[in-house]
Regions:
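Cross-family detector of peptidyl-prolyl cis-trans isomerase
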Residues: 19-187
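Flanking scaffold residues of small Cys/His-coordinated metal-binding clusters
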Residues: 11
Length: 187
């Protein structure tokens, strides 16, 4: 009699553990990084067909789908993993809506100003996760292509941005992010 009860309890335990493994970071299904990246590559190509950006050149990273449109070259070397990067940025969705910036005048002009926030130079460790002083992964891929004083646009597929995070009021889940950036320098 004990063996069927133990077997039933073991089955329930195994099922509950295997179901927990199928939950993603935000409680939903596991995030499909490759599937979303494939979709975003198409969406970015369509966006670039209609988006008018002046540029010196474009860099498409085949592994990540990140696109960097270099508008002003800058000088010197490019930052590497571990460098502290100093930058200005304005983040938009592909529909043009601005969702974030570190520039107070841009925030005020676009009704996203928050008086509790400091609008300072954005500082992060290149190649580090946000939880360790870094930024979203797409920033690291994009800023590696710029030089000090350089300006550009970094287009980031959702797997290298905020993925399917439901907790961002101005950024829908699985959004492609478009950042206008200026690399002020790095240490």
């Amino acid at each position: 009699m004990k063996k069927p009860i133990i077997a039933a309890l073991l089955s329930v335990l195994i099922l509950s553990v295997s179901c927990d493994d199928q939950l993603g970071m935000f409680g939903g299904p596991v995030y499909d990084r490759e599937g979303n990246l494939a979709i975003d590559r198409v969406r970015i190509a369509e966006y670039l067909e209609t988006a008018a950006y002046d540029s010196l050149y474009r860099v498409h990273d085949p592994a990540t789908g990140v696109v960097v449109i270099v508008q002003e070259e800058g000088v010197g070397s490019r930052p590497r993993n571990g460098n502290v990067v100093y930058a200005n940025y304005t983040g938009r969705l592909t529909n043009g809506n601005i969702f974030d910036t570190n520039l107070e005048d841009v925030a005020r002009a676009n009704d996203i100003f928050n008086e509790e926030r400091n609008y300072d130079i954005f500082t992060f460790f290149l190649g580090q996760p946000a939880s360790q002083g870094g930024a979203i992964e797409g920033f690291s891929h994009g800023f590696r292509r710029l030089r000090s004083g350089g300006k550009g646009v970094i287009i980031i597929p959702s797997p290298f941005g905020y993925q399917d995070n439901p907790n961002l009021p101005n950024i829908p889940e699985n959004s492609i992010l478009v950042f206008e950036v200026e690399l002020l320098g790095f240490d």
